[in-house]
Curated annotation (Swiss-Prot):
The protein's name: Myotoxin-3
Transmembrane region(s): none
Keyword tRNA processing among UniProt keywords: no
GO BP annotations, alphabetical order: envenomation resulting in occlusion of the pore of voltage-gated potassium channel in another organism
Organism: Crotalus durissus terrificus (South American rattlesnake)
UniProt keyword annotations, A-Z: Antimicrobial, Disulfide bond, Ion channel impairing toxin, Myotoxin, Neurotoxin, Potassium channel impairing toxin, Secreted, Signal, Toxin, Voltage-gated potassium channel impairing toxin
Assembly and oligomerization: Monomer.
Signal peptide (UniProt feature, chain positions): 1-22
Predominant location: secreted
Organism ancestry: Eukaryota, Metazoa, Chordata, Craniata, Vertebrata
Tissue and organ expression note: Expressed by the venom gland.
Stated family: Belongs to the crotamine-myotoxin family.
Subcellular location: Secreted
PROSITE patterns, A to Z: MYOTOXINS_1, MYOTOXINS_2
Function description: Cationic peptide that possesses multiple functions. It acts as a cell-penetrating peptide (CPP), and as a potent voltage-gated potassium channel (Kv) inhibitor. It exhibits antimicrobial activities, hind limb paralysis, and severe muscle necrosis by a non-enzymatic mechanism.
């Protein structure tokens, strides 16, 4: 049973520390995840939620106020 706990902890840490894939779909479009209330200018730079976390949306870099 201890082995299962150790295995689970190891797998959890392995996925938690995986580098470079956070919000990959948004970054491929040239954007970053911003708070949902942010206005993206021009509107074509607002990609919506995509793979951003809850209450955030993907906007093109350097857009909005």
């Amino acid at each position: 049973m201890k082995i299962l706990y150790l295995l689970f902890a190891f797998l959890f840490l392995a996925f938690l520390s995986e580098p470079g894939n956070a919000y990959k779909r948004c970054h491929i479009k040239g954007g970053h995840c911003f708070p949902k209330g942010k206005i993206c200018i021009p509107p074509s730079s607002d990609f919506g939620k995509m793979d951003c976390p809850w209450r955030r949306k993907c906007c093109k870099k350097g857009s909005g106020k």
